[in-house]
Amino acid sequence: MAADVSVTHRPPLSPEAEAEAETPETVDRRTPEQELPPLDPEEIRKRLEHTERQFRNRRKILIRGLPGDVTNQEVHDLLSDYELKYCFVDKYKGTAFVTLLNGEQAEAAINTFHQSRLRERELSVQLQPTDALLCVANLPPSLTQAQFEELVRPFGSLERCFLVYSERTGHSKGYGFAEYMKKDSAARAKSDLLGKPLGPRTLYVHWTDAGQLTPALLHSRCLCVDHLPPGFNDVDALRQALSAVYTPTFCQLASGQDGQLKGFAVLEYETAEMAEAAQQRADGLALGGSHLRVSFCAPGPPGRSMLAALIAAQATALNRGKGLLPEPNILQLLNNLGPSASLQLLLNPLLHGGASGKQGLLGAPPAMPLLSGPALSTALLQLALQSQNQSQSQSQKKPGILGDSPLGTLQAGAQPSNSLLGELSAGGGLAPELPPRRGKPQPLLPPLLGPSGGDREPMGLGPPASQLTPPPAPMGLRGSSLRGLPKDSGPLPTPPGVSLLGEPPKDYRIPLNPYLNLHSLLPSSNLAGKETRGWGGSGRGRRPAEPPLPSPAVPGGGNASNNGSKAFPMKPRLLSPIASNRLPPEPGLPDSYSFDYPTDVGPRRLFSHPRESNLGAHGPSRHKMSPPPSSFSEPRSGGGSGGPLSHFYSGSPTSYFTSGLQAGLKQSHLNKAVGSSPMGSSEGLLGLGPGPNGHSHLLKTPLGGQKRSFSHLLPSPEPSPEGSYVGQHSQGLGGHYADSYLKRKRIF
């Protein structure tokens, strides 16, 4: 159904009548988008000459029919009268691609060598076909040549660039051509310029066939009419409005496949002159309350093809910068990211917005709530709960590497713990099947930072922070010593200010070295001496001491029976240099855990070696390794006599050439004379000196030049020719060892 619109147009008038008809009413009826001032004839001539020169500036020629053995030099000699910028010869196809100085030389070369002969072969010379020519349409009429070059130059090297001007007025017709040296540059320019807004217009870019583009075809016969009234669909009214001078041969409104109008129309005239006259009369014409904007389309295609091209170009321009799928909303994005990533994404700008510490000109901002919007607060809360539920369910379903997760044993009604490590228990590690204590859950991590329970007092660690119900020992660990023992589950008061490592010894001598100072290793609150408290507390008395389990004595003279009752004993000398006897374990405490192994199996068995017969009379103990002599540590008030040196420790560089026992004895006498310890300053760092029955030297790696010696792995070096004398110019043991190594290295 045709819309009820009013069309206002003027019949063709002579120049004299046209001047007389310029009335305010006529000016109001025709309001073009942009009025351009008239140009003088000289400026019109210059613009037209520039367009013609650029249009003919095709300087690339193609030579066909060359002999198969032609060389590049022969082509240069053939075109010696011209200035060659580029020449490529394809011997297999017998062609040459040549770029000359300008289009005039290219035309002259074509006229001279076309259908000429070279070695009795006829040549064919013509312009190279190009596929990098673009037509940029819907430009503002006031755009100059320099501005157009600036618009298209950033995408690549230009071969030609020019605007098309009207032969009557000299003004731009609103489109121009740009030819690039490479096709990929032209494709990039088309992709970036299509749909780009330039002033009040939107650019349209089309590929152009340079072979079909002639000087006569530079001027378009098609017009594009936009700024139509909303919902305008009367084709006859539009045809009548633009038939004031000439009647168009084609007039159609643009519509999509669904029949929806696109808001513009395309008209085609018989000649370019008719189209130009219709454009000048119809531009700014009032139609249905709107002023039409009439512009030139790209030249070449007919009106029907141009209409389809403009519809496709408009769709591309509207979807500029968008993907094929619709943009997802914020909820879909957060759902795809997951709860943890969503929380981090939402909270980062809120938490770190003022992390820089910079304040505005008016000072610090007032205190504002973290989440001002209730919807955002609710969303974050739901995400947090969902993330927590997922993490808990995953941790309960998936067993850990060492067995079931400790989270799986937590009851549903248990309250969350306030501490990450929980409360220290009275014993060692927790069994996986430990039931939670009433009111408080079990700690998530066992107290692996140090011993607890009965081991704390002799080590100088102080009493434990609190006590939980001791867990039942696994069947593989508990033995007959646990049967029949009563359970103890009474809580103890938590002493204030006690760290995980407990209290340091009161008579500990702080080293003078600032890097080994105790202040840099332990908290300052633990440096002050405190009263040593046992397991007893208010309302609870100390249990009577029970005799320790009997075990064979150590050859070194120390009593290691209590230490041998545990799988991995913590020595009393580990954190204190004071010699003291270990308190017997109390019943029901994890201190009474033990292995049910024979008396001939102990920690020394872990380090056993077939090289035991070399020690002679100093036979190794069947239960524990012999500690080093007392000369390896500081004098102690209550220590036992030192035993023979273990064959696993060699304390000096001489152990490279002698057995461990002999080298250790030599080094011990040397240390007595010098007054230093072979273990270095680290021996007294935390009281790690080995006691009479301690094996702290097993917990260390030998320092720099101190290595374990095994005479059966490396051959014994030859004795030094200089004996034990080391003079000023003597090579000593090091030089002799190097010579011996060079002699014997081939056996490896």
Swiss-Prot record:
Biased composition (Low complexity): 675-685
SUPFAM superfamilies: RNA-binding domain, RBD
Residues annotated with Phosphothreonine modification: T31, T469
Keyword Phosphoprotein: yes
Tissue expr: Ubiquitous. Detected in aorta, brain, gut, heart, kidney, liver, spleen, uterus and skeletal muscle.
Subcellular location: Nucleus; Cytoplasm
Broad class of where this protein is predominantly found: nucleus
Pfam families, sorted: RRM_1
Region Disordered, annotated ranges: 1-42, 390-505, 525-647, 672-731
InterPro entries: Euk_RNA-bind_prot, Nucleotide-bd_a/b_plait_sf, RAVER1_RRM1, RAVER1_RRM3, RBD_domain_sf, RRM_dom
Molecular function via GO: RNA binding
Region feature Interaction with PTBP1, mapped onto this chain: 307-401
Domain RRM residue range list: 59-130, 132-210, 221-299
Modified residues (N-acetylalanine): A2
Keywords: Acetylation, Cytoplasm, Nucleus, Phosphoprotein, Repeat, RNA-binding
One Gene Ontology cellular component: cytoplasm
Keyword hit for Oxidoreductase: no
Residues with PTM Phosphoserine: S6, S14, S480, S576, S626, S630, S716, S720
Positions of short motif Nuclear localization signal: 45-60, 743-746
Subunit-structure text: Interacts with PTBP1, RAVER2, VCL and ACTN1. Part of a complex containing RAVER1, VCL and ACTN1.
Protein purpose: Cooperates with PTBP1 to modulate regulated alternative splicing events. Promotes exon skipping. Cooperates with PTBP1 to modulate switching between mutually exclusive exons during maturation of the TPM1 pre-mRNA.
Name under which the protein is recorded: Ribonucleoprotein PTB-binding 1
Organism: Rattus norvegicus (Rat)
